[in-house]
Amino acid sequence: MNLASQSGEAGAGQLLFANFNQDNTEVKGASRAAGLGRRAVVWSLAVGSKSGYKFFSLSSVDKLEQIYECTDTEDVCIVERLFSSSLVAIVSLKAPRKLKVCHFKKGTEICNYSYSNTILAVKLNRQRLIVCLEESLYIHNIRDMKVLHTIRETPPNPAGLCALSINNDNCYLAYPGSATIGEVQVFDTINLRAANMIPAHDSPLAALAFDASGTKLATASEKGTVIRVFSIPEGQKLFEFRRGVKRCVSICSLAFSMDGMFLSASSNTETVHIFKLETVKEKPPEEPTTWTGYFGKVLMASTSYLPSQVTEMFNQGRAFATVRLPFCGHKNICSLATIQKIPRLLVGAADGYLYMYNLDPQEGGECALMKQHRLDGSLETTNEILDSASHDCPLVTQTYGAAAGKGTYVPSSPTRLAYTDDLGAVGGACLEDEASALRLDEDSEHPPMILRTD
């Protein structure tokens, strides 16, 4: 997620972008001295900044380890890592129409592509690489980076909103099907055909997220009060949660837990909501024996005579757990992870911090802040809540994509790049001898990083 402000300035820690890896991946050969044994589950965070990009690993609450830093490319506005491999896709503000695919462990550039307009988002899984422009989407084969398909003339999408499932069998892409209402277009990236159009919301979409299995899709609109979950590819509404009633907010991110049991939603407010995806078993009706019981039965029966909007509110789920962030107005991205066998909520924010909260999977309630780590390169780590005064700033609700669409701060080349072929993406020179038969999804060729303990 891009963390730049509306004016294009980086956050307090000079951050431009932050994103968690697609899943919690086992790192082979981790040191016993580090308390990780031979195999350990490590959560990874990619950060782009004015000075380059970095990768952090998080195997415990107390330690955020920087495993890689690159300062060769400045103003990195997009940095997407393929799970915990060494493959990374990079876009810079200085060349916003150019995508570079690199092997960061070797320090080599594998290939690059130039597009006709600003790149607003890049998504990766082990089958496909997706490049999102304002009015088109490019589907690349991750094995050789060839363009397989182009979705043209999509509704204007200045925020670059899209989501890609990480599941190989359910490899779906979701993106807005309308610029005026909350329709979701679901596209099968393996068979290269449209799968479904889901009428998710009345207002335009603001956030999308697949679960790990690729069978559920969470959606939120610009209004930000209701979160919905649909089955994929059928498009049946499975869950509906109400984030709030009093005010409309800008949803920053949605994230499922790896088991698909929880869904988190962060916004431009100080509250992160966590919903539990469980179907309540219907109990057989019982005759009420008290006055309050009779009153409740009459109340539920009366809902059938109320307007549909009011009836829906009675049936919407509420947050299972909440998190109170020490700031309001910063762009942020959340993730639900299991670290040291305990469910945690992780929040990376434009103020330059990573916040870690404990989640009680049985009781829920308000989550406790366990740790916060600096992401700007310093070694500062603290348990204390930052002074709220240091977080006071105008609300930041516009993404890099939205700003780019309005031409507010993204540099553009003097001449517009024209399409040179029917696919619309210009491939640069491959810089590896074996690029003609790249196997970018193979860990043997692009192995995970090994945690260093020296």
From Swiss-Prot:
Induction info: Expression is repressed by ZKSCAN3.
One Pfam family linked to the record: PROPPIN
Compartment list: Preautophagosomal structure membrane
GO biological process, one term: glycophagy
Sequence ranges of the WD repeats: 15-60, 67-104, 110-142, 149-189, 193-232, 238-277, 320-359
SUPFAM superfamilies: WD40 repeat-like (SSF50978)
Modification Phosphoserine, positions: S413
Outcome following mutation: R242T: Impairs preautophagosomal localization
One GO CC term on file: phagophore assembly site membrane
Record motif L/FRRG motif, residues: 241-244
GO MF, one annotated term: phosphatidylinositol-5-phosphate binding
Tissues showing expression: Ubiquitously expressed (at protein level). Highly expressed in heart, skeletal muscle and pancreas. Expression is down-regulated in pancreatic and in kidney tumors.
Topology versus the membrane: Peripheral membrane protein
Family annotation (InterPro entries): PROPPIN (IPR048720), WD40/YVTN_repeat-like_dom_sf (IPR015943), WD40_repeat_dom_sf (IPR036322), WD40_rpt (IPR001680)
Family: Belongs to the WD repeat PROPPIN family.
Its biological purpose: Component of the autophagy machinery that controls the major intracellular degradation process by which cytoplasmic materials are packaged into autophagosomes and delivered to lysosomes for degradation. Involved in an early step of the formation of preautophagosomal structures. Binds and is activated by phosphatidylinositol 3-phosphate (PtdIns3P) forming on membranes of the endoplasmic reticulum upon activation of the upstream ULK1 and PI3 kinases. Mediates ER-isolation membranes contacts by interacting with the ULK1:RB1CC1 complex and PtdIns3P.
Assembly and oligomerization: Interacts with TECPR1. Interacts with ATG16L1. Interacts with ATG5. Interacts with WIPI1. Interacts with WDR45. May interact with NUDC. Interacts with ULK1 and RB1CC1.
Description of its domains: The L/FRRG motif is required for recruitment to PtdIns3P.
Name this protein carries in UniProt: WD repeat domain phosphoinositide-interacting protein 2
Organism: Homo sapiens
